[in-house]
Amino acid sequence: MSMSKLLSPPPTSPPGPALSRLPCRRVAPPPVLPFPFPLRRLTSRRVFATSCSSSDSEHAPSASSTALAGAGDDLSAGVTQEREGALPFVQLSSGIVLRTEEQSLLGDHAPAPAPASAASSFALLDELNGGCREDDHLGETPAYPAAMNALYAACLAGNATEQLWNFTWPAAVAVLHPASILPVAVLGFFTKLVVFAAGPLVGELISSLPRIPAYRSLAAIQTAAHLVSVATITYAFAVHRAAAASLLLRPWFAVLVASTAVDRLACVALGIIAERDFVVQLAGAGRPVALAKANATLSRVDLLCETVGASIFALLLSKNNPLTCIKLSCVISLCALPLLIFLCGEMNRLADGIFDHSENTTSHAEKTSSFSIRKTVEEAVATVRNGWSEYMRQPVLPASLAYVFVCFNVALAPGALMTTFLIHQGVRPSVIGAFGGSSGAVGILATFATARLVKELGILKAGAAGLIAQSALLGAAVVVYLTGAVSRRAGALFAFLGLIVASRAGHMAYSAIGLQVVQTGNPASKAKLIGATEIAVASLAELAMMAVAVVASDASHFGALAALSATAVTAAAGMYCRWLANPSDELRRIFPS
């Protein structure tokens, strides 16, 4: 088919004398033409609407007019001759509608546009392709890319010290009483209790404070809590060791509980600021692809820190006793604090100072002007009640509750209880470090695979796939443990640990996907309050499991904790899949795909 035939009037237009062509002249159309779209007055030089989510192959022009015409139904182009004072438009089925400006807008002395040639048509299509790719690039780029890199560096510095600390303190406490997991379980119980009770308050408090000073202060508080914990554990090693039950009644243990709770609370607050505020603001409004990439990068940073922390812990423990390891961990925290403070300020500078003020400075000033203890307590209770109310009303509540159920898994995951269990089993430090490091490495790989999983299945179904995979692998790990071969054969122990490591892929996939589901389903004004309440509910789940661990204080009861952990993850997968099987209208609106 020739280009002249392609540019001929539509077959629905009746032929007649009025349509006869004259050289270099415009022709007038018949009085009525069946336009597929109403003609509207244009105010811009070139207005086009395009679906930039389509692949480049859908928008790329053909190399010849024959290829362009051969597109058939996939390229239904209707070119109509213009009315007096209106230029033609080209309708493409790929979603591109190009309209040129009215001749009256060209000026009195502007020459009339010449009829479109094949070369000019291709040039227009090339320009549209370039605009689509430019829009894609803008949607994938954060609003403040340099500041986002500074945020990644700050999270790297903070998470590295935190992950190393999370390995060293359980090992040191476990050595205080090698025959029982009770001290570690009690510390975990009270830590989760404090986070559960104060989580919504923390979310409200950090919303009323300038973000940069609050972030720096929390980092300093966390480091101070590490110092107090190290001093307390050092004192505990110096005094005469007692039975596990009487050890809990010592004054130094109460101080250790308080410092550990403060450390965890500061960690939660830092995470809320970084994941629910900083990353959202730096990604920019209306840039979901940039936000998704930023969330994935933060997950990789956290997992990289987990891998590095476990490796450093294994190296330190192989050459030193647990007390020396925890002292070195505290020194690393002290060294990282100045770097963290600097990177936080640098991030704000690169973001043009968007974090200089709190989000609600007026209400905060009103609160501080009329301070009273009774009013403060009433406001705290109201904040907690409001946080729970907003959390229960969120449209993506099942996705958040599935994450809470996953948090019941405190036994079959790298953490305090698993580290204590492995030490009691007499496992070598290199194996403990390899377990933690490989768990982080698998998580990092999962963040890359998650993007493809979301592309193939969609974000909601990809979350279900992650939960199902995690529940299946943890169930297999429990079966291996309950056979009783873990304590007798090294092969069974490695199989048990290997299944847990593999389950981290599903865990991290749902962690990344669930975070974006909750971010997308809730307005920005309520993000930190709902996020803090979600963490409080998750701490309640961990609190319940730690209470079970306190009751089953003997290491021989670890199998019961493992079975409960696997059951909770299975329940999370079932609840999430049921939610997807019966979607509400609100869910279809938020996630139309």
Curated annotation (Swiss-Prot):
Broad class of the protein's primary localization: membrane
Membrane-spanning residues: 181-201, 219-239, 253-273, 303-322, 323-343, 403-423, 431-451, 462-482, 493-513, 530-550, 557-577
Sorted UniProt keywords: Chloroplast, Ion transport, Membrane, Plastid, Transit peptide, Transmembrane, Transmembrane helix, Transport
GO cellular component term, pick one: membrane
Compositionally biased intervals (Pro residues): 8-17
SUPFAM superfamilies reported for this sequence: MFS general substrate transporter
Listed InterPro entries: Ferroportin-1, MFS_trans_sf
Compartments reported by the entry: Membrane; Plastid, Chloroplast envelope
Listed GO MF terms: iron ion transmembrane transporter activity
Disordered as annotated region, ranges: 1-23
Keyword Transmembrane among UniProt keywords: yes
The organelle targeting sequence, given as a residue range: 1-51
Bilayer disposition of the protein: Multi-pass membrane protein
Keyword Transmembrane helix: yes
Gene Ontology BP terms: iron ion transport
Role: May be involved in iron transport and iron homeostasis.
Family that this chain belongs to: Belongs to the ferroportin (FP) (TC 2.A.100) family. SLC40A subfamily.
PANTHER family: SOLUTE CARRIER FAMILY 40 MEMBER (PTHR11660), SOLUTE CARRIER FAMILY 40 MEMBER 3, CHLOROPLASTIC (PTHR11660:SF51)
Protein name as annotated: Solute carrier family 40 member 3, chloroplastic
Organism: Oryza sativa subsp. japonica (Rice)
